Amino acid sequence: MAYSYTEKKRIRKDFGKLPQVMDVPYLLAIQLDSYFDFLQQDRAIEERLDVGLHAAFKSVFPIESFSGNAALEYVSYRFGTPAFDVKECQLRGVTYSAPLRVKVRLIIYDKDSSTKAIKDIKEQEVYMGEIPLMTENGTFVVNGTERVIVSQLHRSPGVFFDHDKGKSHSSGKLLYSARIIPYRGSWLDFEFDPKDNVYVRIDRRRKLPATVLLRALGMSAEEILETFFDTSTFHIEKSGFSVELVPSRLRGETATFDIKDGEGNLIVEEGRRITQKHIRQMEKAGLERLDVPMEYLFGKTLAKDQVDPNTGELVCECNTEITPELLEKIGQAGITTLETLYTNDLDTGPFVSDTLKIDTTHSQLEALVEIYRMMRPGEPPTKEAAETLFHNLFFTEDRYDLSGVGRMKFNRRLRREGDTGSGVLDNQDILDVMRELINIRNGFGEVDDIDHLGNRRIRCVGEMAENQFRVGLVRVERAVKERLSMAESEGLMPQDLINAKPVAAAVKEFFGSSQLSQFMDQNNPLSEVTHKRRVSALGPGGLTRERAGFEVRDVHATHYGRLCPIETLEGPNIGLINSLATYSHTNSYGFLETPYRKVVDRQVTDEVVHLSAIEEGDFIIAQASATVDESNKLTDDLVQVRHKGETTFMAPDKVTLMDVSPRQVVSVAAALIPFLEHDDANRALMGSNMQRQAVPTLKAEKPLVGTGMERFVARDSGVCAVARRGGVIDSVDAKRIVVRINEDEIIGGEAGVDIYNLTKYVRSNQNTCMNQRPIVRPGDVVARGDILADGPSVDMGDLALGQNMRMAFMPWNGYNFEDSILISERVVEEDRFTSIHIQELTCVSRDTKLGAEEISSDIPNVGEAALGKLDDAGIVYIGAEVGAGDILVGKVTPKGETQLTPEEKLLRAIFGEKASDVKDTSLRAPTGMKGTVIDVQVFTRDGVEKDSRALSIEQSQLDEVRKDLQETYRIAEEATFERLKRALIGQPVNGGPKLKKGDTLDEAYLDELPRSQWFKLRMQDESLNELLAQADEQLENRRKEMDERFEDKKRKLTQGDDLAPGVLKIVKVYLAVKRRIQSGDKMAGRHGNKGVISSIMPIEDMPFDDNGEPVDVVLNPLGVPSRMNVGQILETHLGMAANGLGVKIDRMLRDARQQQVAEIRDFLGQVYNTAETRQEDIDSLSDDEIITLAKNLRSGVPVATPVFDGAKEHEIKHLLTLADLPDSGQMTLYDGRTGDAFDRQVTVGYMYMLKLNHLVDDKMHARSTGSYSLVTQQPLGGKAQFGGQRFGEMEVWALEAYGAAYTLQEMLTVKSDDVEGRTKMYKNIVDGDHSMQAGMPESFNVLVKEIRSLGIDIELEG
């Protein structure tokens, strides 16, 4: 087994029993693939698929002028290079985007020609705005901040049949409906009312009888009836009436007369129900016609118009009910055959016939006018307008599009052949939908389940961006059409016709302010990954949380392997915002697919198929944990399977598919919870959500008990530096890693060096600190995909959100009441949960009406001490320690001219006029903040002179760039000469400095030869001469490239910044704040066990064991039983064993080296290779690697217990025994204060604890004086507004109950909204007089005004 660089250093013991059939896929693929398809940037123009931008252009172009004499065609598009890279965009606060240039062709036709001959063709590239680019980690940088576009789960286009569940009508009758939902265009609904008439609605407007729509399609009443009904044929003869018999139609009816066969034998007696047996007798007797009494025809409905055969006169219309009078009339007219509609109450209702009777329209025109009136009430209809409107609704591609997925769903639901077809509707589509609806009402067929994932699809970022782009293009199209008519006469070029602003505005609006474009959650790597894999049912075209019912939010059987049943938000959005399951991805139609292994005749194969919820229904699917023998055959007599949404047991030979992995059910965050199978789902939900809120600690520590998913999240999150190609580490420092590439991975003409510049102390969106630390050393060999540097919350390539803490589950003096957590002082001393938070503070200098604001250290009325940390430019030094109220950037603002007294005038005349006409508006550190300045950025408007600080920052950045480029060149040069040296040594030469023909080159000569002279060597081997020439050219090109890059960077740095109007200068100060853990901070485990720290106890007071080892954290045992998250107990036991093994290895490491290696190798074999678990190849490691591994295991042997395939109880006990610990997992603890043993043994072990981003420093806040509400004059609320604590109604009752009248008066007046009283009080306090005089609260005045506004006069007396 080959181990990666990091795996070799610290192997995680895996308790998984099931084989790893399929690796965890790339977790961000859903974002990157979707946006790649949208841009198709790297695809050749001729290979571009009909999706994304290409499809948007093709759907809008060609644009023809109104006259048809000119047209604008789309040819192709390309992207320019972005003006700034990602880091520069974040720094400058601009969007990371590339210019889109579209090649269009203007064709002008000859007006006079009858064949539309082409008169002129002009082709030109047109700029169509900036398109935001996705970073390699699946995010967008919009206005300097990283954002994520969340995928949307919406109703798939197609046709859906449903009923109202009996809620609409008091009788509880089910009213069936059908809805055709297009991707773009008007919705079409058919619905039954309680009287069983069929109605149609367009875009949920007023309903019309459905036959109005059919008439508008050009159908007559006869055609409508013929389409929806079978007919019965009656013959009128002199002897009486007879009907052409279809025996099966009589089944279930009651005979109203005797039915006899041809020989007069009685088959069915009058009054008897006709059964299947009777029908067989009729068929046997060969009855074709049946004589019926006249009364049998009464009440039947005519299927055709009845015309007098002699005169051609209409006797009666179709859909007329037969009465004795009508029958007589028909008889007189000499009509011999009648066709009536076949209906019955059981399974062939007269719905369309009844609807026709209430339909007031009689012709196509009337129907079109009726539809026009419904769509455009109040507008006078004309024939043309009505026809155009109706045609545009469903039958033109510009206004209506079912899309490929909609047509596929439509055809499959109506059981048609083929999945493709037109994007617009036709008559047959509408008739088929009505027919299916009527069949469902008649009891044939089922309604659809809208929550089935076969009826909901994912709209990813690329698709949403395409739709938005198309919206912009359609706006452009209107303007272009108007200008095209002038194109010929004025000789315009394509550039003059197209205004790109609407497109740019539409795209900008989507990325900047769409509900689904969200500020990225960047607390830790997991929160980034989860945010990108999130699926929301909210957003444009989706649900609203107010309207979403319980069914939409609930877990559905089809979520299995597609959406996580556990991870969703708590609160009003529960169930509406979900997370993708681990192995889930979307197919070309946008439906979620999950992988399965094929099973053939009990044999489980390694062939993997990906199925959507629609395709999965017909298969019988076993779980991944189904028992198989050595040859991968299912062994059980009955296997637990899923089939059509139900879980059941079946014989193994019926099984067709099997799950790929037990973790395929859950999302990434839930798959990180060990022993998830032992936790209640509600607590697991909290656990997976709280992992996303964990703050990266100063030193990340891998979890002792993990699930094996940790390295996949770290790998795909993008926070680590990952080797792009394999090679040897050349040099490493804190900021840069240089890798010399393997020969076989070098692409021709390259230097063979990869340089990784690391992220150092950068602020994340959540103000946490992003920092990368190298984990490689010079000389290490790395392969492609190996982790070179850990990011925040990553430890040696493993996700590490928290710290392993020594736990005890016991009550301790009430300090762990109600989920409170008691921790030891040692945790604070060792900085286990210390985190760094970076605050960005901004000072903006504007151009005001009274003059420009100035950033300077010359600030009026401020002492020297306050200016001590500022430089000459008035900006704080890097490294300065600042506290609340300290000046960070000195700024003065011009003040309005005030009337001066003669004395002031005299002073101004003597001392100059600077001091009094400016006021101090400096940027100060906010209250409650204390930290160190780690960076300062100065942005200056183009044309404004840069200050000394801006120039020094610019110079230091240029020096950094120069150093970087020189280093790159040096390494490239060395690598090139190293390659040349290897090729040249021992080779004969034709000539060269101090060489004769035939000499062979040796190492000593080459070492002495100046490098500039190497290229003068002439070798006998011509290929070596080519190699030398090639190397010389490459180095020259590289030198030029470096110069160009430096000049480019210099130009970017020295040019002015593009700032908002009126802004002259922006100074950004970055403060690093160190937050130690303290009382009031929120902590949690991974099982939903959260709590607030109640107290931090001295180490000596904490409970300790027989070895004198104190515990770090004391948790309340009552937090476990009612919450049903037993996983935390199992984690604690297994963590104890893992730590115990580490202690044992530590003891071994202290022995002599020789015995040590053998003993450690043997012990590691015992630890890793137990009978049932996955085997690790310890023998493949060298002695040095074994020692390195053992050293890394000192703090504990990390274990993986995959979800639903984790460690069993006996395995945990085995490890505890191996670590020489009691297998009960409990031990005697002693009270640290008294030294007495506690009454009973206590569960002690190691649990992984997280510090959540709910820190008491961010919440704690106290107001002295501050701003007041405008109307009520009461203090504002909340920390952001520097508000007060609300003294509400109930608090008033409390003071009333205590009888504390004066305290209550103070609260309601001077401390709240008595304006005069509080001003007076302030003055009194300043003067040292602590008395108060309460006045009238302002809110009382507001109340009086409110009452007066209602017309009630209210006055105050006295």
UniProtKB/Swiss-Prot annotation:
CDD domains: RNA_pol_B_RPB2. One of its GO terms (biological process) is DNA-templated transcription. HAMAP family: RNApol_bact_RpoB (MF_01321). Keywords: DNA-directed RNA polymerase, Nucleotidyltransferase, Transcription, Transferase. Pfam families: RNA_pol_Rpb2_1 (PF04563), RNA_pol_Rpb2_2 (PF04561), RNA_pol_Rpb2_3 (PF04565), RNA_pol_Rpb2_45 (PF10385), RNA_pol_Rpb2_6 (PF00562), RNA_pol_Rpb2_7 (PF04560). InterPro entries: DNA-dir_RNA_pol_bsu_ext_1_sf (IPR042107), DNA-dir_RNA_pol_bsu_external_1 (IPR019462), DNA-dir_RNA_pol_su2 (IPR015712), DNA-dir_RNAP_su2_dom (IPR007120), DNA-dir_RNAP_su2_hyb_sf (IPR037033), RNA_pol_bsu_bac (IPR010243), RNA_pol_bsu_CS (IPR007121), RNA_pol_bsu_protrusion (IPR007644). Belongs to the RNA polymerase beta chain family. Its EC number is 2.7.7.6. PROSITE patterns: RNA_POL_BETA. Coiled coil: none annotated. The keyword Plastid does not apply. It catalyses: RNA(n) + a ribonucleoside 5'-triphosphate = RNA(n+1) + diphosphate. The keyword Zinc-finger does not apply. SUPFAM superfamilies: beta and beta-prime subunits of DNA dependent RNA-polymerase (SSF64484). The gene is rpoB. It is an enzyme of class 2 (transferase). The RNAP catalytic core consists of 2 alpha, 1 beta, 1 beta' and 1 omega subunit. When a sigma factor is associated with the core the holoenzyme is formed, which can initiate transcription. GO terms for cellular component: DNA-directed RNA polymerase complex. This is DNA-directed RNA polymerase subunit beta. GO terms for molecular function: DNA binding; DNA-directed RNA polymerase activity; ribonucleoside binding. DNA-dependent RNA polymerase catalyzes the transcription of DNA into RNA using the four ribonucleoside triphosphates as substrates.
